Amino acid sequence: MFLIDVNVLLAAHRGDHPNHRTVRPWFDRLLAADDPFTVPNLVWASFLRLTTNRRIFEIPSPRADAFAFVEAVNAQPHHLPTSPGPRHLVLLRKLCDEADASGDLIPDAVLGAIAVEHHCAVVSLDRDFARFASVRHIRPPI
């Protein structure tokens, strides 16, 4: 199963994103395939915060458009909801220790812990996931 990170969702959704032309076709293939994938609610919250933010995008996505994207992706039959499970804090601590994570790396460790617990590969444009030895990481084409 794939766990999709916010930067992949932003690149797929926003036509003005520098990686849109390469990430969107990859993302469309993911949606058309039968491979299970997940987008944790934490990632969706980040997506909504960033894509509708005037400080991030000169022309932010209208909130209705952003939610329509969220709902369309979540409606895919092979999208499986995930959330932190009973081992989350133990896994989070392990990942933080192995990568000496603090500050801005903590959210990546949180996603990594969800991925490990649910046997997912993290799909992200963020190279920081390589710092977590026990997290499988896939970088879509850019």
From Swiss-Prot:
The keyword Nuclease applies. InterPro entries: Mtu_PIN, PIN-like_dom_sf, PIN_dom, VapC_family. Residues 3-139 form the PINc domain. Mg(2+) binds at D5, D108. Keywords: Hydrolase, Magnesium, Metal-binding, Nuclease, Toxin-antitoxin system. Its cofactor is Mg(2+). One of its GO terms (biological process) is negative regulation of growth. One of its GO terms (molecular function) is RNA nuclease activity. SUPFAM superfamilies: PIN domain-like. It comes from the Bacteria. The keyword Magnesium applies. Gene3D superfamilies: 5'-nuclease. Its EC number is 3.1.-.-. Toxic component of a type II toxin-antitoxin (TA) system. An RNase. Its toxic effect is neutralized by coexpression with cognate antitoxin VapB25. Belongs to the PINc/VapC protein family. This is Ribonuclease VapC25. It comes from Mycobacterium tuberculosis (strain CDC 1551 / Oshkosh). The lineage of its organism: Bacteria, Bacillati, Actinomycetota, Actinomycetes, Mycobacteriales.
